Amino acid sequence: MIYSRSRLPSEGEILIATVKQVFDYGSYITLDEYGGLQAFLPWSEVSSKWVKNIRDVLKENRKVVVKVIRVDRRKGTVDVSLKKVTDDERRKKNLQWKKIQRLDKILELVSQQLKLSEKDAWEQVAWKLEAKYGDPISAIERAVKEGEKILIDAGVPEIWIKPLLEEAAKHTEEKKVKMSGLITVKTSEPLGVQKIKEVMSKALENIEQDYESILNVKIYTIGAPRYRVDVVGTNPKDASEALNQIISNLIKIGKEENVDISVVKK
């Protein structure tokens, strides 16, 4: 379980959340980095474009990246926005989230070895490394390569150091796999370039959240009308499934937007 130093997030924070309940007027979500704290996503903050049905955008149990827009510390309530998160913020958060998950897994295993709680691990290891270096998992990776002084300098208690380094060494080197597909994209619509960009952006939504092992996805031209779809991850099965899902999304959304998309090679 992931523990935060603060009970409530701050306005402007970008967070990973899980959709729990979807209503006509909005959605209740839980903030994964704040112990499952409930937050409210108003309908007006779901999309910057008109959406006929909120369930076309939000699905229960799906991970989403949100921005905190209001915090009432007296009542303990939090409101968030989906539409205010930029593509760059979403990409960076997904990469950070994968690091946080790796950190959490390492701390869980080490705390079990030491017969201590996961909260102890976060307080005595993660928070100390964060205070000293900013990014706990990067600090642990440095310690694996450079030695225990990295941990000692941050004030990590001695009891954690040896088992932490041993466990972290098993998790720091992940082999990457890359899956690619070729497609052709054509449209006779006015503002066709913008329309194609919108279709591609929609097709990539939630892919990195739905597949935890996926590190990066992108679609780029190799000479119009040909485009390449690249999926990079650490699990070949997930990478293949994600690629198929993206191409399926492209074809489906393309039909809805009068953009003709066909597969050249997968």
UniProtKB/Swiss-Prot annotation:
One of its GO terms (molecular function) is ribosome binding. This is Translation initiation factor 2 subunit alpha. Keywords: Initiation factor, Protein biosynthesis, RNA-binding. InterPro entries: NA-bd_OB-fold, S1_domain, S1_IF2_alpha, TIF2_asu_arc, TIF2_asu_C, TIF2_asu_middle_sf, TIF_2_asu. Pfam families: EIF_2_alpha, S1. NCBIfam families: PRK03987.1-1. Residues 12-83 form the S1 motif domain. Belongs to the eIF-2-alpha family. Heterotrimer composed of an alpha, a beta and a gamma chain. eIF-2 functions in the early steps of protein synthesis by forming a ternary complex with GTP and initiator tRNA. CDD domains: S1_IF2_alpha. It comes from the Archaea.
